[in-house]
Amino acid sequence: MKSALKKSVVSTSISLILASGMAAFAAHAADDVKLKATKTNVAFSDFTPTEYSTKGKPNIIVLTMDDLGYGQLPFDKGSFDPKTMENREVVDTYKIGIDKAIEAAQKSTPTLLSLMDEGVRFTNGYVAHGVSGPSRAAIMTGRAPARFGVYSNTDAQDGIPLTETFLPELFQNHGYYTAAVGKWHLSKISNVPVPEDKQTRDYHDNFTTFSAEEWQPQNRGFDYFMGFHAAGTAYYNSPSLFKNRERVPAKGYISDQLTDEAIGVVDRAKTLDQPFMLYLAYNAPHLPNDNPAPDQYQKQFNTGSQTADNYYASVYSVDQGVKRILEQLKKNGQYDNTIILFTSDNGAVIDGPLPLNGAQKGYKSQWICPYISRHLLSLNPLLACCRRYSRGER
């Protein structure tokens, strides 16, 4: 059993990062997992240190977007091929010329493309599930979510079993400052409706989502949390933002607020003189996306469709947020010792623009997602890894 797992679990979230050379704690992971008393919780066990993992403790940023399709980035020659895109289904509100879609997609991700140029792009990376909750559970546990009874978003919102070891617990046990910013979606939750006169078409506006205490991020390995517990949140005026256990007001556009929080984490780790592990989970470009982004993002796009412009602007807001974070890392002298793993929770949604859509359709685009790893090893730029990877054991 262990031999078979070793061959397939190269693809777990932790092993993917290990392959990037980061796990200073790898030799101790199996002992940590035993504390959970679950015999099947083997995703973090049986790893040994490498020459890179024993050199020190690099900072780690695990950065996710929400419903970003593989085709949103030019991962291979077919990503932005007009002939490939001609017969793709697109709902009327997002129908724009293929050339305009390609141009907008390219303009929306310059920073992410630079990370890809600097690191490794995984052209055959698959998520563990086609929807958010189970997929994120795989990120945190390194295990197929079916192993612990999570088959849907509804299951995830009943809470990931407390017997499961979460990735940040291992970092925390080995001296890391750990922080989660953005979307959580792994707690047992309760929803309290907001007054009817404040409800909107965006269902995320219509209730405040609370997490049960045991499933709070601070009880799953994170020293600090700022974000939301549900499947999504409004881009403006969210009623469901929390800093640790206290509700906090929304401040402007949600992507900017999450970026500001992430920069605060980076600065705090420097002040504490600790290595850090940051899980930064943006909600963009999750729908509905009816409201335009701030002008510095929105003005970049003029596809002929307001909804398509809103979509691309939300992606660009994250891209520029990542740029700000990278600049802060460089300013603080942390950049050269920071590993960045970028991905999406699942593929693009049906109700979205080209280049790629397909989440919840059972198509390949629901399961294959962008993976980029910017790490400390001396690897050639534009290196592509075509071996199949998945965030959960099979």
Label each residue range with its predicted role.
Residues M1-H28:
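Gram-negative bacterial Sec-dependent N-terminal signal peptides
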Residues A30-R394:
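Formylglycine-dependent sulfatase
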